[in-house]
A protein has these predicted regions:
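Acidic/histidine metal-binding catalytic segments
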Residues: 85, 126-138
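N-terminal secretory signal peptides and thylakoid transit peptides that target proteins
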Residues: 1-17
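C-terminal region of N-terminal signal peptides and the immediate post-cleavage residues
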Residues: 21-32
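Divalent metal-dependent phosphate-bond-processing catalytic cores, especially two-metal-ion Mg2+/Mn2+ enzymes
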Residues: 15-19, 53-59, 63, 67-82, ...
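Acidic/His-rich, divalent-metal-binding segments that scaffold phosphate/diphosphate chemistry
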Residues: 31-99
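Short, conserved micro-motifs enriched in small and acidic residues
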Residues: 56-60, 104-112
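His-Asp-centered metal-binding catalytic motifs of divalent-metal-dependent phosphohydrolases/nucleases
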Residues: 85-103, 114, 138-145
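An active-site-proximal "capping" alpha-helix that borders the catalytic cofactor pocket
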Residues: 109-124
């Protein structure tokens, strides 16, 4: 993309990480538990879904996003099970790009398609409380820059949303500053869950979906903007064109 993306918003259990089936070598000198994941029954079923549905590079992105989210929160003194629900952050991070899978590919833009799939997945597993709303909101918003930085958003919305979106943003473009993650932590994460093409590979899926179904890339959305930048010859309504077509004659 030609314009810079905000690094902050660009879009705890035992060692389940060892069973994560993500491709990579064991991380050297990792602190016990720092590369672990929640091991609740819901976390395990979510991991199974992601393992089956997401390509390895996308699955690794999802797993790294959680690890970065938890580590960045820890750098701020925010502790799991005390200041936030780690399972809920895990659900958001693992499911946030399900709209880029075959299973989640609908007529909706990928963020909303993924949010809908995540909500249905939780409901099908008997989860019908506020967690469904929190997961849906976080996934649907995860490419909307700066929203979770609003002081009112941070005060009124669940902490898990901002924590998860911070981790996703870190994995997309890197930490905002050297102190956002513990020293050497990113290297240990990447040793176990390598990037495998990283976010450029993710972008290729987004573009392919948009080319196959332009309804998934409406103008002035992230998918629409990326499609326009990659394929400028394709029709792309500007804001003035949309206004010119309005039925009120303004």
């Amino acid at each position: 993309m030609s314009h810079p993306i905000s690094r902050r918003a660009a879009i705890g259990g035992a060692a389940a990480g060892a069973a994560a089936v993500a491709i990579g070598a064991p991380a050297a000198d990792a602190t016990p538990g720092e590369l672990s994941f929640p091991t609740t029954w819901l976390a395990r079923r979510t991991h199974t879904l992601v393992t089956r549905a997401q390509q390895p590079f996308l699955r690794n992105h999802s797993l790294r996003s959680f690890l970065f989210a938890r580590a960045a929160a820890g750098q701020q003194g925010r502790r799991p099970n005390e200041h936030y629900d780690p399972e809920l952050v895990y659900l958001i991070c693992l499911l946030h790009d399900m709209g880029l899978t075959d299973q989640g590919n609908t007529d909706q833009r990928f963020e909303v398609a993924g949010a809908d799939l995540a909500a249905r997945f939780l409901e099908n597993h008997g989860i019908t409380d506020h967690r469904v709303d929190t997961v849906w909101d976080a996934i649907a918003l995860h490419t909307s820059q700066h929203v979770h930085e609003s002081p009112v958003f941070q005060r009124r919305r669940p902490a898990e949303i901002g924590i998860a979106l911070t981790g996703i943003g870190i994995d997309l473009t890197g930490p905002d500053d050297p102190g956002q993650l513990p020293p050497g932590f990113a290297d240990r994460v990447h040793a176990r869950y390598p990037r495998l093409g990283g976010c450029r590979a993710l972008t290729e899926i987004m573009v392919a979906q948009s080319l196959a179904n332009p309804r998934k890339a409406p103008p002035m959305t992230l998918p629409g903007e990326i499609l326009h930048q990659r394929h400028p010859a394709l029709p792309y309504p500007t804001w003035d064109m949309i206004l010119d077509a309005n039925t009120w004659g303004d």
